[in-house]
Amino acid sequence: MAEGEDMQTFTSIMDALVRISTSMKNMEKELLCPVCQEMYKQPLVLPCTHNVCQACAREVLGQQGYIGHGGDPSSEPTSPASTPSTRSPRLSRRTLPKPDRLDRLLKSGFGTYPGRKRGALHPQTILFPCPACQGDVELGERGLSGLFRNLTLERVVERYRQSVSVGGAILCQLCKPPPLEATKGCSECRATFCNECFKLFHPWGTQKAQHEPTLPTLSFRPKGLMCPDHKEEVTHYCKTCQRLVCQLCRVRRTHSGHKITPVLSAYQALKDKLTKSLAYILGNQDTVQTQICELEETIRHTEVSGQQAKEEVSQLVRGLGAVLEEKRSSLLQAIEECQQERLSRLSAQIHEHQSLLDGSGLVGYAQEVLKETDQPCFVQAAKQLHNRIARATEALQTFRPAASSSFRHCQLDVGREMKLLTELNFLRVPEAPVIDTQRTFAYDQIFLCWRLPPHSPPAWHYTVEFRRTDVPAQPGPTRWQRREEVRGTSALLENPDTGSVYVLRVRGCNKAGYGEYSEDVHLHTPPAPVLHFFLDGRWGASRERLAISKDQRAVRSIPGLPLLLAAERLLTGCHLSVDVVLGDVAVTQGRSYWACAVDPASYLVKVGVGLESKLQESFQGAPDVISPRYDPDSGHDSGAEDAAVEALPPFAFLTIGMGKILLGSGASSNAGLTGRDGPAASCTVPLPPRLGICLDYERGRVSFLDAVSFRGLLECPLDCSGPVCPAFCFIGGGAVQLQEPVGTKPERKVTIGGFAKLD
């Protein structure tokens, strides 16, 4: 029974030792110098927070041409950047240099370099090529002497060496052979001792008796970090410079205005952060292992995908080669046919010329015919022969080869193809689309339009994302509503919430993947549901002076000849007429919104609403007036009625003339341009591209807005005791265009439903 327990205890101890050994071996890569790939020896902390051995740093600076900036390796150190090398106690003690001589040595070694004069106005900045971050790090003028030693890293390296070394006990350096195992160390004496030797070399009552014993070690370090500038113990930490400083550094102008905290506070804060971070990592080991498995799977997928990409490229290039080979064969066949045709013609021409030689062919036959003495027979035979001889004579006099020997017409121009082949490269993802803000707007629905930048790779389809910005943010990442595989360069968002702000963005996709998102565009939706109506010119509209479009969404006032003829009857004044157009839909409840565009060249146009009964009563057969101050809105904007009347006005209009909006001096209740004591001072604002009218039937209020930015222009009270309809008044020439609902546009769009997939 006891043997079983002992075996179990031994097994657990061995398992613990194996785990410790494995952990230390896995940690070894953190203790290797990036230059020499060996354990750190007197590591220095670079400004980039990476570490490097002092000897390696000195060697690297020497290779870079910075001579004299690495310190004197034979001198005894007096700064954190240099420390005494391990010295055997049996060797004779080296004479320490005097402090003043050492100071001069350090200044000469660390403060000058070839090519610089002492006291130069612009000292050289030493750059150290950090092997870890692959960048140049500024060391300042002092070089390595301005760096701190990483004593903590030294201690970790020492503990690691002791843990992995088998039978590597540290021996007493003062014992006679054979030495005993050391039990103490002395940083002042820089030696290790057994118990007897420590008592012998630290006798009671002497100054050495005050030396504090440490654990035995082969590498002795300073007790603490010293300021490289003032040789004082560092006591504070500068958060701005992220550097340890002493009391003297703290009051220097270099750290003026910096956030400086005691080392104890910085120590506690960093220790707490490191402890929490380490605890989080240790508490999520399963997550780490899962991510490692995911990365390994990604590596395998990368290998497979890379091989597939290679095969695909090879197949495509082979396809190009096959097309080129087929084209080469067809071109060579065309050249061959042309060559044979030319050779045939030239051979026939040679045969004809050979027949002209003496005694052969045509010439020989002609010579024999000339021997004929019978005249009728000669005439019969010589007639046809003479024609052939005449043609041969003409060909002989105007000799020219029957075919050209040049094949210049068969030259290939492959410049464009060579350029295409040279520029042949992997397909890139589409660039970020550019949203067309001139065509993108929100009305009854949201219409989004975009385009790709010039020279952008094509996009097969797009992804449109949108969300409301005026809702409380939910914890976690921002959630977007998404519509994928959108064809074309426009999209339609149906049923948006009224009085909201939407942010939208687009990105393209092709075979190479998804591109970058476009810049976000913010759109304000109308404050109320959009009212759909058409223009009705049956009430108060003169067909001679008003022209309504076929779709009944636009109207133009044309004064024309009838107005001029009517004006001839008047001896004085300016003859004007008021024409009105109403909407064919009346509002009896709720809130409604619509928008229109007024021609900036209009003389005087009034846009607004009114009680349907009052509008028909006032404008049916409306008389011509002789004053431009005549106003049909029962007091609004004109001062025609007593302002003291408490009853709500039946009309509310916004006056537009010559590209300006005429407003009164009141605040939000700019219902008219006159006050109780007389005409009020009026002001004008520029006419926006579109005007919006929002009617709140229950509250009896109507608001006029800039339909682009939804900035309020005017708010008026209104009598809503009956049906209220839109109204447009014209004095002189002018034009109004109702904003067409997005859903009726003939342009091809992609509809995005109100319930889209969440990201």
Curated annotation (Swiss-Prot):
Stretches the record annotates as Disordered: 67-98
Tissue note: Expressed in primary hippocampal and cortical neurons.
Positions with biased composition (Low complexity): 73-89
GO molecular function terms noted in the UniProt entry: zinc ion binding
InterPro entries on file: B30.2/SPRY, B30.2/SPRY_sf, ConA-like_dom_sf, COS_domain, E3_ligase_FN3/SPRY, FN3_dom, FN3_sf, Ig-like_fold
Pfam families hit by this protein: COS (PF18568), zf-B_box (PF00643), zf-RING_UBOX (PF13445)
Ranges for region Required for proximal axon localization, axon formation and migration: 1-166
Keywords noted in UniProt: Cell projection, Coiled coil, Cytoplasm, Cytoskeleton, Metal-binding, Phosphoprotein, Repeat, Zinc, Zinc-finger
Annotated region described as Required for microtubule association, proximal axon localization and axon formation, given as residue ranges: 411-429
Domain B30.2/SPRY residues, every copy: 513-747
Phosphoserine modifications at: S330, S627
Chain sites annotated for binding Zn(2+): C227, H230, C249, H255
Domain (COS) ranges: 370-427
Assembly information from the UniProt record: Interacts with TUBB3 and TUBA4A.
Function: Microtubule-associated protein that is involved in the formation of parallel microtubule bundles linked by cross-bridges in the proximal axon. Required for the uniform orientation and maintenance of the parallel microtubule fascicles, which are important for efficient cargo delivery and trafficking in axons. Thereby also required for proper axon specification, the establishment of neuronal polarity and proper neuronal migration.
Name assigned to this protein: Tripartite motif-containing protein 46
Source organism per UniProt: Rattus norvegicus (Rat)
